[in-house]
Amino acid sequence: MEASSVLLLRVSSVVDKDVDHPQFFDPPYALKYLQAGLQKYPDVTVHLLDCWVHPITVSDMLARAEGIRPDLIVISSSSFDAQVANDFVASMKQQQEAPLLIGIGQSHYLDRDVRNIHEKDYDAILLGEPEQEFFRLFDQIRARGAGDGEWREHYLRCYEQGQRFAVEEPDRLSFPSYTPEELESYRSIFPVQVPKRVVWGYLIATRGCPHGCVFCSEVMRVSIGRKMRSRSAANVADEMEHLERQGVNICSFQDDSFSADQRFVKSLCEELVARDSKMPWMARVRVDELDYELLALMKQAGCVMLGLGVESGSQRIIEQMQKQRHPKPWPDLCRQVFQWTRQLGIGTNAYYVIGNPTETREEIEQTIALALELKSDTIQVHFYTPYPGSMAWEKHKDVIAQHDATQMFHYATPMFALADVSIEDLVKLRSQFYRRYIFRASFGLTHMRKHAAFYWHNRDIFWSLLGIRKIFR
């Protein structure tokens, strides 16, 4: 089989379309890496269809596939896309000359029985990070043919055993490229102190996360495992320049924990300073992995914003989450780090979680009080959601089994209450959280002083963020 035409498909999300919280869509990172690698085959035509940014029905997906007539389709689906993906795959397999169907994505962690493969729906499913393993599979298909049993048996066995594939040599991955339309579709909604229309580019510099937060799951991560696998600083800086040539003028590192490998962060910042890089960037970091010297170097290297998981103002809840590693009490550690970022002029987005197991109303009030004290530029308040693969999922699976896990989403109204607060009151508390944070006179004045020029050039983002008012209903 030549496999000369490949369709890369991210199926439509069916849960978050009615969520009342502002959000934006990340690129389908794994598919973009596959696209970049496949484009190096001179005889292969690659098509990418992202139904997250262009939502279409299963019937429309089938029609698009019929128009392309690919030899192979890679279907990427998240936990809340599982049914859509299964419907598409089942329909494709009914065709007389069905293409090979390869499944990737977190939906396959939900219920890892082998029903789909045994019923010949998918020809193979790659758990974990498919960006390198896919090409071993692809080369076998091209060399041995679609009907070869050896590669099928191998990948069936890997799936049955729950084997997660990992990118062990990230420097060898090809750099993804983006069309102008894609760059427009994947615009982040974070306000940054950049006085021009921003064109966001996205990178994954490190893979893995050494921490063991109870709520963390591969379903919501971009990588797997605790083993850190960092790219070289030069390779990352090269990709930033690659993105800049495509029109990108600000980068976002999407690593699960950008600060986990502090030696890498230091080397990357030194590389960017040595190149006299003018590219501003942001990343998600942990408060217990930062010090003033590292933050100052990050600022010098172009860092304009950091996303920090504060999570809770209750020390008990933080310890229950298994986030506490530093001897200093968590709230005090947060106060110190946010003071440093203000001194250095680095913007901050703080993440909070309410509805934690056994959490009381008083502890949620402690979280709101800490948020008001930290004074981050923006906040995101999530509902506690035990996704598949997390320790929380295992602990509460008897409760979860009574509900449709594919419908769980951390921005959506919880399906069940694990806190000592009712679901109705949790929804009200989240609304109060945002109201009390946003409607302070000091917040409005400070925020607009810092970001007025940004909003002038990025009015679409301003209007997107105003969507938060839906929560106040």
Predicted regions and their residues:
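Radical SAM enzyme core and accessory elements
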Residues: M1-L8, D18-D20, K40-T45, L62-D71, ...
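Acidic, low-complexity intrinsically disordered segments
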Residues: E2-A237
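Hydrophobic/aromatic residues located in beta-strands of well-ordered beta-sheets
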Residues: V6, V46, L101-I102, C251, ...
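Radical SAM [4Fe-4S] cluster-binding motif and immediate context
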Residues: D26, P176-N349, A369
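Conserved strand-turn element in the central/C-terminal portion of the radical SAM core barrel
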Residues: H54, R286, G313-R325, F338-E363, ...
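Catalytic cores of alpha/beta
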Residues: D113-I117, L294, T358-E373
